[in-house]
């Protein structure tokens, strides 16, 4: 029997890191549009480079994709998804950090097909996000943000 295209593919594991960036209760989102084939609101994230710690990757990617210099407050968790390329099946794990920005400034990275960026209230951000796994991460991160805020710890960097 012939192998199906799916069975013929190599499975590749990839790791990315990203941030749920919050300023004054609002969440930073990016709008991606790749040649009109892919569009939607996403959280900033990207691939781990050699020798990088996950937190470093998350902070670097947030800065590269949005122009925002954020502080990593705490690790939120990971999401996983699978996608197909021409030759492989890629299993991607994304490690997420709750981050704090120091202003509403953001500038989407055009080279990565980001056309827009901005800070949105939780319920807006939740509904705008294209991927359910990113919605779940947002939910978890925002809950932790609320708890830190109630405890008087949000915005007080010396606690972390």
List each model region and its residues.
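N-terminal strand-loop-strand
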Residues: 8-43
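Charged phosphate-binding loop/patch that engages nucleotide di/tri-phosphates or the phosphate backbone
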Residues: 130-160
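Classical N-terminal secretory signal peptides
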Residues: 1-2, 160
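Unchanged
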Residues: 48-136
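Acidic, Ala/Val/Gly-enriched low-complexity intrinsically disordered segments
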Residues: 2-8
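Functional cleft and adjacent loop/helix regions within the main domain
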Residues: 44, 50, 159
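A generic structural signal for ordered secondary structure
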Residues: 18, 26-28, 55, 75, ...
């Amino acid at each position: 029997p012939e192998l199906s295209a799916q069975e013929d593919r190599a499975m590749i594991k990839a790791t990315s890191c990203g941030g749920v960036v919050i300023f004054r209760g609002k969440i930073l989102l990016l709008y991606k549009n790749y040649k009109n084939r892919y569009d939607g609101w996403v959280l900033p994230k990207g691939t781990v480079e050699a020798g990088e710690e996950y937190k470093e990757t998350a902070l670097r990617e947030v800065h590269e994709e949005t122009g925002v210099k954020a502080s990593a407050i705490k690790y939120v968790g990971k999401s996983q998804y699978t996608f197909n390329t021409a030759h492989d099946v890629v299993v991607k794990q994304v490690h997420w950090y709750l981050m704090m920005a120091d202003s509403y400034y953001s500038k989407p990275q055009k080279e990565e097909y980001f056309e827009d960026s901005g800070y949105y209230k939780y319920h807006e951000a939740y509904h705008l996000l294209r991927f359910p796994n990113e919605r779940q991460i947002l939910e978890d991160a925002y809950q932790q943000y609320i708890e830190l805020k109630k405890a008087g710890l949000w915005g007080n960097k010396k606690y972390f």
